Amino acid sequence: MDFSSKIAINKGWSDDKKYCVTDHKQQKYFLCVSDKEKLDSKKFEFDMMEKVASLGVPMCKPISIELCGDEVHSLHEWIDGKDARETILTVSKEQQYTYGVEAGNILRKIHSLPVTEDREDWEPFYNRKIDDKIKKYKECPVQYENGQIFIDYLNANREWLKDRPQVFQHGDYHIGNFMIGEDRKIYVIDFDRFDLGDPWEEFNRIVWSAQVSPSFASGMIDGYFDDKVPDLFWKLLAIYILTNIVGALPWALPYGSEEIAVMQNQAKEILEWYEDMSQIIPSWYLNKKTAE
């Protein structure tokens, strides 16, 4: 397809190149350009996006994927709108909560896709992940203030990882990967971290949502569970959030002091939410009545 204009989009952590392209009929599209080494993973991602789109999920629907020389080009519908993270606070708390409920409903649809791949049981797989992150954290020259609380909690609560189901995951599900369209609807974007795992692990990045909008984060949980949140969810959510934050400091190290400070601040906030892990439901969680 020939395009009359091509504007680079410089956002996100992906090493893919992203563009807003326009054809000769002034129709806009989203173009993602990847190295040809990623062809197989990009084909899988494209296939998964087609399946998600077929469920009626609001998103940049996939149109085509092809190898162009040394590059993989995947073309998607364009959404006119703004990043949810930048616009969510311009609407009422009730509307923030409603957007969160919709995000939870979308996630439940994504998790309904049938999984045919064989996968190792979740408990041994995730325990290795915890061990690896704790090891790297202990080797890290920088530490969190009171970081040992995270490690002690993880080691004392691994039993909850038993017998967990596994589903297809979006892989990076938080407020930074949503857009609010000009039609005021919410759209999910950035499917390039698709994975398999415990459906509830998908909430491990809800920290980013809660820091921006507790109403959105709370709505996401209520929407996913249709207002019936099981006790086990809170136990596992704490494990998944803490595993992430323990692994975040060694990850941030190469990016420098600014990124390290972001993670140290997040670790401090997590301890405040959980009162040094003495309570299991984070303090930002608002049920439907208090969100309104």
Where do the model's predicted regions map?
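An alpha-helical support segment within catalytic cores of ATP-dependent transferases
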Residues: M1, S112-G171, D222, M263-M277, ...
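ATP-binding pocket architecture of kinase catalytic cores
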Residues: A8-D121
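Active-site acidic catalytic loop and adjacent metal/ATP-binding pocket
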Residues: K17-T22, L154-F203
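Short strand-connecting beta-turns/loops that link adjacent beta-strands
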Residues: H24-Q26, L67-D70, E182-K185, L242-I245
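Short beta-strand segments
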Residues: F30-V33, I63, F168-G171, V188-D190, ...
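A general structural signal marking secondary-structure boundaries and capping sites
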Residues: G56, E66, K82-D83, L107-V115, ...
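Glycine-rich, phosphate-binding/catalytic loops in enzymes
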Residues: S92-K93, Y187, N204-V207, N265-Q266
